């Protein structure tokens, strides 16, 4: 049994390891509110396209 078979073989059904950004597959800084499931970097990039507006 090599390293490739063991690495990431544990099932990820819940927790931070089970979710990733739908745009870039990043697992850090994930925004899950309203079912967005995108990381904060991608949110800044696509927020205007999604329909979010910056308030003064």
Swiss-Prot record:
Binding, Zn(2+): 21, 24, 39, 42
GO cellular component: cytosolic small ribosomal subunit; ribosome; rough endoplasmic reticulum
Keyword Electron transport: no
Localization terms from the record: Cytoplasm, Cytosol; Cytoplasm; Rough endoplasmic reticulum
GO biological process: cytoplasmic translation
Keywords attached to this entry: Cytoplasm, Endoplasmic reticulum, Metal-binding, Ribonucleoprotein, Ribosomal protein, Zinc
GO MF, one example: structural constituent of ribosome
Cofactor stoichiometry and binding remark: Binds 1 zinc ion per subunit.
Cofactor: Zn(2+)
Classification via NCBIfam families: PRK05766.1
Family listed: Belongs to the universal ribosomal protein uS14 family.
Oligomeric form and interacting partners: Component of the 40S small ribosomal subunit.
PANTHER family registered for this protein in UniProt: 40S RIBOSOMAL PROTEIN S29
Designated name of the protein: Small ribosomal subunit protein uS14
């Amino acid at each position: 049994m090599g390293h490739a078979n063991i690495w990431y073989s544990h099932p990820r059904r819940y927790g931070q390891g089970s979710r990733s950004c739908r745009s870039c597959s990043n697992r850090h800084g994930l925004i899950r509110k309203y079912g967005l499931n995108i990381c904060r970097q991608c949110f800044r990039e696509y927020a205007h396209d999604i329909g979010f507006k910056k308030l003064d």
